[in-house]
Amino acid sequence: MDENFVAHQLSPSSWSRYEECPRKYWLSRQRLPRKASMPAAMGTAVHNSVEDICNLDLSDREESEIGWLPPTAKAILDRHWALEKEAFLDTPRHPRWKDEMITKAHDGLVGALNILFSKSRMEKTALSGVSVGMWRNVQSMVLANEGTLVSECGRLMGRLDLLIADLDEDGNSTGWVVADLKTGKPPKIDLNEKVSRQLRFYRDLIKQNNPDHPPLHAEGWYSSNQTVHRAEGPSVLDDAMIAWEGMRHSETPLEGTPESQSCGFCEWKAWCPTWWAARRDGTLPPGGVFRDEVVNLVRFDPN
């Protein structure tokens, strides 16, 4: 093996960055200071809360107890919200922390729990009416949560939110569902191509790692409006391996492809001369105030 070889893994997010702009992907691997994001912090708090609620030990509670889930969920979310706030404010590059977004986070958590409960095929009920016994049934349906998926070759990886049993109307398992929880804006009709590819990526890794798997499909669960969108289509692993080849480590910066959409959401553009040149030359339209310029102070003359 080449002594200068640097191992790398492709994930759905790094794949998307590479496609949008190879320079963006290259910069993301240079250990530059990351920028905290309020939507990302909220999403992490909701995801981690769902994980904890799925893993609750309810062995010391009565099967018939109700009214326990809303306050338990709130306490768990509040704890993760505080942890995310601390990490957010400790990040050198961060905007204002928005305490008011905890309401949206709470609604997202309720939405996620409602979707999960609906998959149990039990009669629909408010979360306050969910008994301990009912939630144990939900937990028994969850086969895995918040796990890491890695391909056989080790080159592809992803983070699994939930793997659940696909139940029929009688509560019998007929297969598996790979579920990815989404706290962002839901699609109006169909999943966009990148989200569909992400979901199929998880689906295909599970198929590869479990040759004797039952019928399996992938879904995006959108907590904001409690909708479920199924990802259909062929395997994406061959395309992922082709992309992996192009994403090999390079000391030389990869090509920059400035474009309004990809540059607008790039947290590393302050380190990208291509972005600065595109702004200067008019390739990119002037935008609002950009507060992340990175400079080296060479000399300061107070006079």
Model-derived features with residue positions:
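Structural detector for short beta-strands of small beta-barrel domains
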Residues: 285-302
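Mg2+/Mn2+-dependent nuclease catalytic core
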Residues: 137-242
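Short, charged/polar micro-motifs that form catalytic or ligand-binding hotspots
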Residues: 5-8, 12-13, 32-40, 149, ...
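Short amphipathic alpha-helical segments and their helix-coil junctions
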Residues: 5-7, 20-34, 178, 182-184, ...
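Metal-dependent nuclease catalytic regions and adjoining charged, substrate-binding loops involved
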Residues: 9-10, 189-194, 204-290
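A non-catalytic, helix-rich entry segment at domain boundaries
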Residues: 52-143
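OB-fold (S1/OB) nucleic-acid-binding surfaces
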Residues: 181, 302-303
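Nuclease catalytic cores
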Residues: 15-59, 66, 74, 106, ...
